[in-house]
Amino acid sequence: MSKQWASGTNGAFKRQVSSFRETISKQHPIYKPAKGRYWLYVSLACPWAHRTLITRALKGLTSVIGCSVVHWHLDEKGWRFLDMEKQLEDSEDFLEHWHDVAGGIRTAKEDSSKSFAEIKNDSQRFMVDATNEPHYGYKRISDLYYKSDPQYSARFTVPVLWDLETQTIVNNESSEIIRILNSSAFDEFVDDDHKKTDLVPAQLKTQIDDFNSWVYDSINNGVYKTGFAEKAEVYESEVNNVFEHLDKVEKILSDKYSKLKAKYGEEDRQKILGEFFTVGDQLTEADIRLYTTVIRFDPVYVQHFKCNFTSIRAGYPFIHLWVRNLYWNYDAFRYTTDFDHIKLHYTRSHTRINPLGITPLGPKPDIRPL
């Protein structure tokens, strides 16, 4: 996309506020919990949508809430699905992929990206570039927005949590969608282990909310404010802020590792990694929200968004250990991370930043072994 991202004349990027902010609960007058009623529309490239896929998997909701994946290439009309008119829709793959952790996209199962030279922006590889939209045959995410609200006039973003019964958008704010998925709303449809999974435990909620607040502004959104800056002074301010807060995360994780090493001994790495998280000694929403930025940092943000003081692997040993622990030891993280979609989306969609559309092959590997 070649249009400007800055708001006004100061050259600073401003993120759009989400428009659909409902929830799902037994008490809600419209949106009641039900198996098969709700659907997620996501991009595997998008860090905000990635949050929802990880949460959906960790909570055991893949069989409860289906998922469709848009094409990695974002053009002037927005996110799009594959045209499936010529596909065999009764194939076994077609029937099963909706409830896969990554919507059936095959490259999400791979831990290393490949050559991109022969891949065109209009590539139509089923369950590689995208899936179709199975309910209405829509070609664009925008079609869902207009179906929900014919007067909608803002940008067409993902993720979208959709209600098939009322044919409306429940919510398009990722931070709220993951809270909906983590709530007890769908407990009757999952097993006991997943019922016990709580990504925002009451005793840690205040700490999680505080951590999320500064991570969002300075890291999650900070890389975008850096990469989309249209004045040098804005860029320099934002990139310094990103790395100041990565330093803060590194200190938190360094201190955490030291305490765990003292508790378990340096040799018991399995026990150390079992409690090596950002807030508390268990996996929480704070880890999910930070992960989706950190996993994209070396492959994309270092070069594409000019966040190039250092890389995670070279400059932040404890963040590097933390992100590899999540990727290699938790399927919900690993199998929703698609390095092909991530690299192709940013380098092919942001023509103002990368006008030739050449996708860098490095770093190699996309993620190092644990």
Curated annotation (Swiss-Prot):
A GO term, aspect molecular function: glutathione transferase activity
Induction: Under oxidative stress conditions. By agents such as diamide, 1-chloro-2,4-dinitrobenzene, tert-butyl hydroperoxide (t-BOOH) and cadmium in a transcriptional factors YAP1 and/or MSN2/4-dependent manner.
CDD domains from the UniProt entry: GST_C_Omega_like (cd03190)
Principal cellular location given in the protein's record: cytoplasm
Recorded consequence of changing R51A: No effect on thiol transferase activity. No effect on thiol transferase activity
Top-level taxonomic group: Eukaryota
One Pfam family linked to the record: GST_C_2
Residues the entry annotates as binding glutathione: R15, W79, R155, V158, E173, S174
One Gene Ontology cellular component annotation held by this UniProt entry: cytoplasm
GO biological process: cell wall organization; glutathione metabolic process
Mutation effect (E173 to A/D): No effect on thiol transferase activity
Residues annotated as the enzyme's active site: C46 (nucleophile)
Enzyme Commission number: 2.5.1.18, 1.8.5.1
Reactions that this protein is recorded to catalyse: RX + glutathione = an S-substituted glutathione + a halide anion + H(+); L-dehydroascorbate + 2 glutathione = glutathione disulfide + L-ascorbate
InterPro entries: Glutathione-S-Trfase_C-like, Glutathione-S-Trfase_C_sf, Glutathione_S-Trfase_N, GST_Omega-like_C, GST_Omega/GSH, Thioredoxin-like_sf
Residues of the GST C-terminal domain: 201-353
Subcellular location: Cytoplasm
Keyword tags: Cell wall biogenesis/degradation, Cytoplasm, Oxidoreductase, Transferase
Additional facts recorded: Present with 1670 molecules/cell in log phase SD medium. A version of this protein truncated after amino acid 200 is not active in the beta-hydroxyethyl disulfide (HED) assay.
Its job: Active as '1-Cys' thiol transferase against beta-hydroxyethyl disulfide (HED), as dehydroascorbate reductase and as dimethylarsinic acid reductase, while not active against the standard GST substrate 1-chloro-2,4-dinitrobenzene (CDNB). May be involved in cell wall organization and biogenesis.
Subunit structure: Homodimer.
Protein name as catalogued: Glutathione S-transferase omega-like 2
Originating organism: Saccharomyces cerevisiae (strain ATCC 204508 / S288c) (Baker's yeast)
Gene (UniProt): ECM4
